[in-house]
């Protein structure tokens, strides 16, 4: 990539669980489908409101929504004492440089929409929304 900090990937918490002593946020995005660079190389994106754990802070792993067993990345801690709940947003920084060019629709997982934020008007403009037809056309 020749540009950094070019865009964010906004995800939503679908479920909060603890498995084998690990706190996991199940998200509506997939590392395997939307952020493959996080699995293929040692790239750990920054998350707004979170940081690398220090000492005995509560650690959170992020789980993706595909059926791939390894569709998770971790771990982070919240900047403030916070116990997340379904519906909360998790915003990954600096994700657009690979998110849009290396994505897959593995098992029909939808691509994230492309949206531009216009801060002077405090509004979002949807440039492209992906759906089933996009998946179907990729299958041939």
Question: Model features per residue range: what roles?
Answer:
Residues 1-140:
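Charged (often Lys/Glu-rich) extended helix/loop segments that serve as interaction or gating elements
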């Amino acid at each position: 990539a020749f540009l950094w900090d070019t865009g964010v990937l906004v995800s939503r918490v679908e479920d909060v669980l603890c498995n084998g002593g690990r706190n996991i946020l199940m998200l509506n995005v997939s590392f395997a489908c939307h952020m493959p660079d996080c699995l293929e190389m040692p790239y750990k994106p920054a998350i707004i409101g979170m940081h690398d754990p220090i000492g005995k802070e509560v650690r959170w792993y992020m789980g993706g929504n595909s059926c791939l067993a390894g569709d998770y990345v971790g771990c982070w801690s919240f900047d403030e004492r916070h116990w997340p709940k379904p519906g909360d947003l998790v915003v990954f920084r600096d994700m657009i440089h690979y998110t849009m060019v290396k994505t897959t629709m593995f098992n029909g997982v939808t691509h994230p929409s492309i949206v531009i934020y216009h801060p002077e008007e405090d509004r979002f403009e949807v440039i492209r929304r992906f759906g089933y037809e996009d998946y179907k056309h990729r299958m041939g």
